[in-house]
């Protein structure tokens, strides 16, 4: 992946906000840019990384050895169910701080698409993670392929993303520009 190196404008803005006990939403339009940004974030982290990959793109890069990280624990729903992954994540962050990357809200909705209450389940899972991250001095990044319509962040399927004042919102636009929304 290094041959197509991307420099992110305003990366320091994101880096300054990734502090212990914080949760952030990362909105993106281009999945490749999201992976490049996550690669840059993780390369600068000292914390062990827990990556929950529900859209399988990151897993593909790791399995094909296009991305290598020594302090990475990767979870995906090809190998485990969401209800098996969550207790493992919560146990790990209760023992020591981690950088937790939840990729993505879109993938979680797809995983739970047969559940009538998928919206409530998705919001409950994300709030459970955010709350536990705050207690454990971990850092949480939740990614979503989303767009803004009438001041609300919406997934491509039209579902509105639950927003929380304690979660910072970062947007990757134009493939390499990072902005923060208050």
Regions of interest found by a model, annotated:
Residues 1-7, 177-182:
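C-terminal regions of RecA-like/P-loop NTPase motor modules
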Residues 63, 112-114, 153:
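Short amphipathic alpha-helical segments
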């Amino acid at each position: 992946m290094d041959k197509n190196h991307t420099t992110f404008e305003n990366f320091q803005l994101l880096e300054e906000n990734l502090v212990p006990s914080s949760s952030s939403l990362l909105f993106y339009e281009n999945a490749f840019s999201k992976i490049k940004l996550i690669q840059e974030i993780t390369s600068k982290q000292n914390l062990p990384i827990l990556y929950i990959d529900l859209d399988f793109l990151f897993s593909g890069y790791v399995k094909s050895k296009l991305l290598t990280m020594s302090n990475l624990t990767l979870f995906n729903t090809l190998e485990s169910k969401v209800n098996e992954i969550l207790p493992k994540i919560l146990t790990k962050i209760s023992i020591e701080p981690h950088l937790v990357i939840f990729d993505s809200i879109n993938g979680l909705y797809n995983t739970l698409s047969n559940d009538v209450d998928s919206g409530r389940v998705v919001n409950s899972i994300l709030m459970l993670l955010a709350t536990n991250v705050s207690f454990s001095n971990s850092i949480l990044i939740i990614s979503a392929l989303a767009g803004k319509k009438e001041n609300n962040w919406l997934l491509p399927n039209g579902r509105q993303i639950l927003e929380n004042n304690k979660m910072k919102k970062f947007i990757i636009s134009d493939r390499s520009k990072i902005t923060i929304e208050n």
